[in-house]
Structure formats: C-alpha cells, structure tokens
Regions:
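S-adenosylmethionine
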Residues: 10, 49-148
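Conserved SAM/SAH cofactor-binding pocket of Class I
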Residues: 2-77
Length: 149
C-alpha cells in the first residue's frame, strides 16, 4: 500500500470505535471505509469523484462480505456539506485538503488528513490555525504526513 494509505489505516484503527459514524472523502477503492465498517462503525459514507472507482469499491465490499452500513456517493468532495460525523477521513491531494479544511469549521469530528507531503505541512498548519483547528497529532512515513485535527 501507498504510505498515505498506511498512515490513514493506522489512524482508523486507533480512532474508529463501534457505533461511530465515519465520512470517507476521496474513498477510492474503499479500504478505509471497509476498515471502519469492520471496526464496528454504524454508518460509513464514502464520497468519491472518480466514477471509475465505484465498481472497484463495490467489488471490495463483496470480497469483504459487507452488505450494510456503507453508502457510496459518486460526488465531488468539495460540494459535500454534511460533516456531522464522529470521524472524517480525507486521503486526498493537498489542494483539495486546503479547500476542505474551512468546510470542517464547527464539526465535532476527529478529522484525519493525509495525501500531504512533508513539504506541505507548514501551509496546511497555517490554514488550520486560521480556522481555529489544532493539529493534535502528526505522523510521518517517507515523504508523507498524516495529521489529526
């Protein structure tokens, strides 16, 4: 797996508890959504813009014998407006994350972000500070970082 997937999976394992609700922005093949479901998340909403990912996502649900509690939305993450979840995941590129952070204002969720290079950190940190978010955790693997707000 890519380093960012590894970083995100570690945070999913650490933060997702039974009964929680999870939003997976940029869900791709569904690995993070599926893991959250397996950990007992009651509701997982997976949002992915790339329509080519949907069949792969659904195939992975079948392979993992998942029939409920995950909903797939072929949608642009930047138009998503509901952030009322326990956990928000976004393993997506830096430019999208820069636009997403202000949208998270007011959420009580743990927000877990990756797809960020170490060189992106200062920029992302400044955006977080401007939006009154505190970086609670920062993990590094190779050239990549994952942060928890």
């Amino acid at each position: 797996h890519h380093e960012t997937t590894w970083l995100m999976l570690n945070q999913v394992l650490k933060h997702v508890k039974p009964g929680m609700s999870v939003l997976d922005l940029g869900a791709g093949s569904g690995i993070l959504s599926i893991t959250a479901n397996k950990l007992g998340a009651e509701k997982v909403d997976a949002v992915e813009f790339d329509s080519d990912c949907e069949s792969n996502f659904n195939e992975n649900l079948q392979l993992n014998h998942i029939e409920k509690n995950i909903h797939y939305y072929n949608d642009d993450v930047l138009t998503w407006e509901d952030f009322n979840y326990n956990i928000i995941l976004a393993n997506i590129n830096c430019n999208i994350i820069e636009e997403l952070i202000p949208k998270f204002k007011g959420t009580k969720a743990n927000v877990i972000l990756s797809g960020l290079l170490k060189t992106d950190y200062k920029t992302i940190e400044q955006i977080c500070i401007k939006q009154n978010f505190q970086v609670k955790e920062k993990m590094i693997k190779g050239e990549w970082i994952c942060i928890v707000l």
